[in-house]
A protein has these predicted regions:
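Short alpha-helical "recognition helix" segments of helix-turn-helix
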Residues: 22-23
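DNA major-groove recognition helix of helix-turn-helix
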Residues: 37, 54, 65
Length: 72
């Protein structure tokens, strides 16, 4: 499954939030922040924390991309 967190980082830019300060306020660690930056999977707990902090829905911070074999 390919995931993109580009929406999250655009939202952070739009709100003037720095990644490291955001992670600290949300309560996610540096490893989770690195995974988000690399579009790797993170725990649902982390996703929920982010959404609650930003007062948004899951679809506002991430999207699931079609797998290469799904694109026919």
């Amino acid at each position: 499954m390919d995931i993109s967190y580009n929406k999250l980082f655009k939202l952070l830019i739009d709100r003037g939030l720095k990644k490291t300060e955001f992670a600290k306020q949300v309560g996610i660690g540096g490893n989770t922040l690195a995974k988000l930056s690399k579009n790797e999977t993170v725990s649902m707990d982390s996703v929920v924390r982010i959404c609650r902090y930003l007062k948004c829905d899951v679809g506002d911070i991430m999207e699931i991309l079609p797998a290469d074999d799904d694109q026919q």
